[in-house]
């Protein structure tokens, strides 16, 4: 399945929840708040979703939030299943370790989509090595920095002035002066967004 290319606001409406896929625009100009119902013709009272349908909707919400294709998402589920421990927690921890998500958490992008573009355009170094793969899984102790040539661009100059307001998760640290972050520890189950119940993903793929 290819990456979703349609209007991202429709994904929020289809999921029935505000996913903040457009970053700051979701605060100031939110289509979901005006039209929270699913897209398409509204023919009377909406049907009640089956348990399977609810699992699918929740699985899609997590997948869309992290900006992944179904194939990528299923691969991460396979990786989580192969690890010891709780599969749902394992999967969410893997998703949090993605480089594009780490940049988003550090405040380098207002959305994961923007953070993914920053990675793909070659602006980011991991332990001094250029890394342009958004799905790269960071490890404990690694340092994430912006290339010196990239710091001279208008985007990163503005970022350096405005990044102060971003709250950083406890498993990451940020040096705002140098625009560099560090993975202090790997994320734990308690660090995961409370909106996401990964157990529904496990149940969906296990049937």
UniProtKB/Swiss-Prot annotation:
- SUPFAM superfamilies, from UniProt? Alpha-L RNA-binding motif
Q: Which CDD domains match?
A: S4 (cd00165)
Question: Which GO molecular function terms does the record list?
Answer: rRNA binding; structural constituent of ribosome
Q: Where does the UniProt annotation place the signal sequence?
A: none
Q: Which residues form the S4 RNA-binding domain?
A: 97-163
UniProt KW Cytoplasm keyword: no
- Name the InterPro entries on file: Ribosomal_uS4, Ribosomal_uS4_bac-type, Ribosomal_uS4_CS, Ribosomal_uS4_N, S4_RNA-bd, S4_RNA-bd_sf
> Where are its TM segments located?
none
| SMART domains, alphabetized | Ribosomal_S4, S4
Keyword Ribonucleoprotein belongs to the record: yes
Pfam families named in the record: Ribosomal_S4, S4
One GO cellular component term: small ribosomal subunit
Keywords attached to this Swiss-Prot or TrEMBL record, sorted alphabetically, are: Ribonucleoprotein, Ribosomal protein, RNA-binding, rRNA-binding
Query: Which GO terms are recorded in the biological process aspect for this UniProt protein?
Result: ribosomal small subunit biogenesis; translation
The job of this chain, per UniProt, is described as: One of the primary rRNA binding proteins, it binds directly to 16S rRNA where it nucleates assembly of the body of the 30S subunit.
Q: What's the subunit arrangement here?
A: Part of the 30S ribosomal subunit. Contacts protein S5. The interaction surface between S4 and S5 is involved in control of translational fidelity.
Q: What family is this protein classified in?
A: Belongs to the universal ribosomal protein uS4 family.
Name it. Small ribosomal subunit protein uS4
């Amino acid at each position: 399945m290819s990456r979703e290319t349609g209007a991202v606001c429709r994904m929020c409406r289809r999921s029935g929840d505000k996913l903040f896929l457009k970053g700051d625009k979701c605060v100031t100009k939110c289509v979901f708040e005006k039209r929270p119902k699913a897209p398409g013709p509204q023919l009377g009272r909406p049907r009640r979703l089956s348990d399977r349908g609810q699992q699918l909707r929740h699985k899609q919400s997590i997948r869309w939030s992290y900006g992944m294709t179904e194939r990528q998402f299923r691969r991460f589920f396979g990786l989580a299943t192969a690890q010891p421990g709780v599969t749902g927690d394992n999967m969410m921890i893997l998703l949090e370790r993605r480089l594009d998500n780490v940049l988003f958490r550090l405040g380098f992008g207002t959305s994961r989509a923007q953070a993914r573009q920053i990675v793909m355009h070659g602006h980011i170094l991991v332990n001094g090595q250029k890394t342009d793969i958004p799905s790269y899984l960071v490890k404990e102790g690694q340092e994430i920095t912006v290339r010196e040539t990239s710091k001279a661009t208008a985007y990163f100059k503005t970022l350096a002035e405005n990044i102060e307001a971003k709250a950083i998760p406890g498993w990451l640290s940020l040096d705002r002066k140098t625009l560099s972050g560090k993975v202090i520890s790997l994320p734990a189950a308690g660090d995961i967004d409370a909106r996401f119940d990964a157990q529904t993903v496990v149940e969906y793929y296990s049937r």
